[in-house]
Design a protein with these regions (language model features):
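Active-site-facing alpha/beta catalytic cores
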Residues: 1-152, 156-157, 179-180, 184, ...
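Conserved active-site beta-strand-loop modules that form the wall/rim of enzyme catalytic pockets
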Residues: 139-140, 171-173
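Redox- and metal-dependent alpha/beta enzyme cores, enriched for Fe-S-associated oxidoreductases
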Residues: 160-167
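Short helix-terminating capping/connector loops at secondary-structure junctions
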Residues: 167-170, 204-206
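Conserved, mostly hydrophobic/aromatic
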Residues: 175, 239
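Short helix/strand-capping connector loops at secondary-structure junctions
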Residues: 221-234
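Conserved small/polar residues in nucleotide/adenosyl-binding loops
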Residues: 245-247
Length: 247
């Protein structure tokens, strides 16, 4: 289950449950971490693996033992800090292509993350330490489209396979049905998923997963004093009924 607690922003805005859990600019981060961990534990107890976005390099020491898969977002895939962090995370990592649609930054990130690194970080006791990582072999690319348009269709997937193989990387591809692939319209996620399903029926073996932005109710809402339960306050999502059909 996609359980994102940190929100990267193009400029400013609500940065997620960990950063501001009460949506009131009180920024009670210590409480946000506890709430996030409690939710992860509850979801784990019903047997669902958990996926999140690795954004703040400190956060994984508090949550990583409950995470099965992490994304490195389009804005941070090019960041050395996030590549180093990914090299030491104990889960599979999906690197998104750049916001311009380029796959090169994700490929470079994958090559970096599979290698060992040394960098400053915190240890499990919260002390500043020199971190030594072994490299993470479980990395792959996430196609999310870009400023030049979507990249989920057959031709784009084939090109991605060729680029990955050309660099000696496993052509394991996850496709993000949202963001630029949906033209930022949550209703288009069904169209994207239909196209992906057809590619798999035709014999594609490189597509190993999809990402769907879903919530209890469809759409989204602005942060206010009167929030409707189960409706996203960030990106627009498909509702739960449609999510079940997608699955």
């Amino acid at each position: 289950m996609r359980s994102y607690f940190e929100k990267p922003r193009s400029t400013v805005g609500w940065k997620g449950l960990i950063n501001d859990p009460y949506l009131d600019d009180s920024f009670k981060i210590s409480e946000g971490l506890k709430i996030a961990r409690k939710l992860l534990l509850e979801i784990s107890e019903i047997g669902l693996p958990l996926a999140t976005e690795a954004l703040d390099p400190i956060t994984p020491q508090y949550l990583q033992d409950l995470i099965s898969w992490s994304a490195i977002g389009a804005r941070t895939t090019e960041s050395q800090t996030h590549r180093e962090m990914a090299s030491g995370l104990s889960c599979a990592i999906g690197f998104k292509n750049g916001t311009d649609g380029s796959l090169e930054v994700a490929i470079n990130a994958m090559q970096s993350a599979v290698a060992p690194h040394r960098f400053l970080g915190i240890n499990p006791s919260g002390q500043v330490s020199i971190i030594h990582t072994r490299g993470n072999p479980d990395v792959h690319v996430v196609l999310r489209g870009g400023s030049n348009g979507p990249n989920y269709e057959k031709e784009a997937v084939l090109k991605s396979e060729q680029q990955l193989q050309g660099k000696g990387l496993d052509p394991s591809i996850m496709i993000d049905c949202s963001h630029a692939n949906s033209n930022k319209d949550h209703k288009n996620q069904s169209k994207v998923l239909d196209n992906i399903s057809e590619q798999i029926r035709e014999g594609n073996e490189s597509i190993t997963g999809v990402m769907i932005e879903s919530n209890i109710g469809p759409g989204n809402q602005s942060i206010s004093d009167k929030l409707e339960y189960g409706i996203s306050i960030t990106d627009a999502c498909v509702g739960w009924d449609l999510s079940l059909i997608h699955i």
